[in-house]
Amino acid sequence: VASLVGSEMCIRDSSKNLVSEMKNTFMEIKQGWPKTLPKNIIHGDLFIDNIFFHRGKFLGFIDFYFSSNDFEAYELATCINALCFNKKKKTFSYDKGKTLQLIKGYETIRKLQKKEKDCLNILCKGSALRYLATRSYDYINTPKSAIIKKKDPREYIQKLAFHKKINSFSSYIK
């Protein structure tokens, strides 16, 4: 059993080779990672705790620590991972309706290009692997005295497994 030992709990995955699986997934993502998609300044961390709404309307967002010049569609992929799964106890299930609404809203401002749609799956995998790796590292290495809240990385094992089953843009919305 692969274990990631943190200061407060031991994270155990039923996979016997989580680290090996992460390395293999990284190599797969690296090989398929797009070279030329539209780039712009992105937030890079649009999770619900960084987005503010008032009476159902977007108000603003905070925490620009991970802002960078990157693929615009990568921002969308991170939003899918952060906002389009429902949690019931310790299980995360994908919600096509949320993704469809997210993409529809996104496209009222900027239409996705065909090549961005074609790359959405690899971008979602890359985003999920990023959060699995960084949250695992933070969970293990953040001292108890730190001000930040450690976040459980295990949800990203489930999200990454979901993305591995998907092979097209339409699978995300239909």
Label each region the model flagged.
Residues 131-174:
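ATP/Mg2+ or Mg2+-diphosphate-binding catalytic cores
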Residues 1-6, 10-11:
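Single conserved hydrophobic/aromatic residue that forms the stacking wall/gate
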Residues 19-22, 102, 119-120:
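A structural signal for short hydrophobic/aromatic patches embedded in well-ordered alpha helices
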Residues 114-124:
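All-alpha amphipathic helical-bundle segments outside canonical DNA-binding/catalytic cores
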Residues 27-74:
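Active-site acidic catalytic loop and adjacent metal/ATP-binding pocket
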Residues 23, 99-103, 153, 157-160:
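Hydrophobic core segments within long, regular secondary-structure runs in both alpha-
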Residues 73-111, 127-143:
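Active-site activation/catalytic loop segments of kinase-like enzymes and analogous catalytic loops
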